[in-house]
């Protein structure tokens, strides 16, 4: 009876150790999978490095080109000139149903206005995102064609832009026409000022390139009369004879 109880206790110990080892292995696998999962979610790049087995030069070229991807921003044209949806605006009916078309036309109108938003180069992606307002206000206070433009005009343009792009209110035909009028006025002012400044630069460059006329240099030769020439020669001979007499006198002493 005692030997049977000892055998059962030994079996229980073995079972406990086996179950404990199994639970430990399962917990280890679970924790490892969770760690790998969070590590993969936190990584921005691919799970395998790009160009892992590529040559060194090719890998560097791949890294250089991939680093330029984050700087690429493109704002496509929303409505083409031959878009069939534009015909819906010409049909009779409730124009409020096509507010989204006026919003798209408002965004495309900025590119069609040919306003040099990128002339300064400080905001190369000024039409992307919310810095459109800060970009124009910044240009308005600097020495650019935007300087001195009426603040009300820029505010009307920017309010219409933000309403068309981000607003949830109504943006119909009247709002679009008001926005288009402000954009056309701003484009006219900027083009006129940029044209005048360009003409001033051209005139200044022309003045710098034109060299002043150089008057020919004249050499004035003064001829002495013969009497003065003879006097100079006589004085030279007297000076030479005096020097010779002085040298002979010094040698005799």
Swiss-Prot record:
It comes from the Eukaryota. PANTHER family: NICE-3, PROTEIN C1ORF43. It is found in: Membrane; Golgi apparatus; Mitochondrion. General regulator of phagocytosis. Required to uptake Gram negative bacterium by macrophages. GO terms for biological process: phagocytosis. GO terms for cellular component: Golgi apparatus; membrane; mitochondrion. Pfam families: NICE-3. The chain crosses the membrane at residues 11-31. This is Protein C1orf43 homolog. Keywords: Golgi apparatus, Membrane, Mitochondrion, Transmembrane, Transmembrane helix. It is a single-pass membrane protein. Residues 194-213 are annotated as: Disordered. The lineage of its organism: Eukaryota, Metazoa, Chordata, Craniata, Vertebrata. N-terminal region is required for phagocytosis of Gram negative bacterium.
């Amino acid at each position: 009876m005692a030997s049977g109880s000892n055998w059962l206790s030994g079996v229980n110990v073995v079972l406990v150790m086996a179950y404990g080892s199994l639970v430990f292995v399962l917990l280890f696998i679970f924790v490892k999978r969770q760690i790998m999962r969070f590590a993969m979610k936190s990584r921005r790049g691919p799970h395998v490095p790009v160009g892992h087995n590529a040559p060194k030069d090719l890998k560097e070229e791949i890294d250089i080109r991939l680093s330029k991807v984050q700087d690429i921003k493109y704002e496509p044209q929303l409505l083409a000139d031959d878009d069939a949806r534009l015909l819906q605006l010409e049909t009779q009916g409730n124009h409020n149903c096509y507010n989204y078309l006026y919003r798209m036309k408002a965004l495309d109108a900025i590119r069609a206005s040919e306003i040099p938003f990128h002339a300064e180069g400080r905001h190369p992606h000024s039409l992307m995102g919310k810095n459109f307002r800060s970009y124009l206000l910044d240009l308005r206070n600097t020495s650019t064609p935007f300087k001195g433009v009426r603040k009300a005009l820029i505010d009307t343009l920017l309010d219409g832009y933000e309403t068309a792009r981000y607003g949830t209110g109504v943006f119909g035909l009247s709002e679009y026409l008001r926005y288009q009028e402000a954009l056309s006025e701003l484009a006219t002012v900027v083009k006129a000022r940029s044209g005048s400044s360009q003409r001033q630069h051209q005139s200044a460059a022309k003045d710098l390139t034109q060299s002043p006329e150089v008057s020919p240099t004249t050499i004035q030769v003064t001829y002495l009369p013969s009497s003065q020439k003879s006097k100079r020669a006589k004085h030279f001979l007297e000076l030479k004879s005096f020097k010779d007499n002085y040298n002979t006198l010094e040698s005799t002493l």
